[in-house]
Amino acid sequence: MKPLRYTASALALGLALMANAQAVTTIPFWHSMEGELGKEVDSLAQRFNAENPDYKIVPTYKGNYEQNLSAGIAAFRTGNAPAILQVYEVGTATMMASKAIKPVYDVFKEAGIQFDESQFVPTVSGYYSDSKTGHLLSQPFNSSTPVLYYNKDAFKKAGLDPEQPPKTWQDLADYAAKLKASGMKCGYASGWQGWIQLENFSAWNGLPFASKNNGFDGTDAVLEFNKPEQVKHIAMLEEMNKKGDFSYVGRKDESTEKFYNGDCAMTTASSGSLANIREYAKFNYGVGMMPYDADAKDAPQNAIIGGASLWVMQGKDKETYTGVAKFLDFLAKPENAAEWHQKTGYLPITKAAYDLTREQGFYEKNPGADIATRQMLNKPPLPFTKGLRLGNMPQIRVIVDEELESVWTGKKTPQQALDTAVERGNQLLRRFEKSTKS
């Protein structure tokens, strides 16, 4: 009977372990963070899981922002959506209209977890809030602004002051020519050309990108980025491209790699690219503010955010939503939000995270790490510089990329390209407007 007793005990222990394993609520989290950023996402999830053994956050990289958004919406339609979906900022209007989401303020309320929406930096939270109620629909996560990265060693070689990055676009054009003449393969390259060269160029120089305060005041907005100021800017880049001082290297973040591998002396890219630059650059580099147009009357104004937020998907059970609320609360805690900001270069999404980072002396030890925040808070945003809320904006960005590429290849003039981009983009806006009223 002794072996039987042991067998029964072992069986009971096994059943208990199985019950405990089954009690763990798994929470799928689809994201677009790769490289060093992906490692930081995994680290956050592991720490949360260790502190909350009843829940298991499972981060999964699902490709770039467009791919992840498409995958998430497709999965929702088949009943297989993740609990948490990371969506880039220009997908906000699409997510709001999708009926696939559960507002984060509802998630916290139903979970009985206190949620102070005022803790988030207003210029960030305003992007993801319901225009009618003011409540957050998604939780800010990896918010960024474009910054200028420059190779200090290359500056020295070209006879430029390594502590003085270009302040205006006119300065940048001059610096790029000198850097190219000094032997650099590429004087200047830009990542995310639509976001930086049109969306943020417009806001930073106090110009609207679209009517209706960039879509915040209604879905009947029309695009307005084909005005003389934007055309002049693209024409300047076109001239730089003809001279070989500006190199077009791709639609997304390809310029960051061209920068940290030493090919390009300067790049405008996301502040969130800092993690990879820190890891891979083998030279002294600096971080500067986005250049502004020297002819713009009140520039610089304020930058608008890029990056992404975390959306909670519909159709999950109560326990899953409780775990989601706990995880989002974990991410917003000052020590976690500050660490994410410091390690990645993304903005501190809460006031407490910014204060903690400053108190820790991080900005003194890492000059330039506060540039993205300073740009966002440079001046109080105007009604048309607080961001974009335009339907089908991901597809509009593709159109902008196509039309700008037609400029770099000499097929169209800047005016022709921007006029066509506005015309094609407005067709998508009308389609979105119609879908929201049907």
UniProtKB/Swiss-Prot annotation:
UniProt xrefs under NCBIfam families: PRK10974.1
UniProt binding sites for sn-glycerol 3-phosphate: Y65, E89, S144, S270, G307, Y346, R397
Any Pfam family the entry gives: SBP_bac_8
Complexes and interactors: The complex is composed of two ATP-binding proteins (UgpC), two transmembrane proteins (UgpA and UgpE) and a solute-binding protein (UgpB).
Protein's GO biological process: transmembrane transport
Protein name (Swiss-Prot/TrEMBL): sn-glycerol-3-phosphate-binding periplasmic protein UgpB
SUPFAM superfamilies the UniProt entry points to: Periplasmic binding protein-like II
Keyword Transport among record annotations: yes
Function per UniProt: Part of the ABC transporter complex UgpBAEC involved in sn-glycerol-3-phosphate (G3P) import. Binds G3P.
Cellular localization per UniProt: Periplasm
Gene: ugpB
UniProt organism field: Escherichia coli O6:H1 (strain CFT073 / ATCC 700928 / UPEC)
CDD domains reported in the protein's UniProt record: PBP2_UgpB (cd14748)
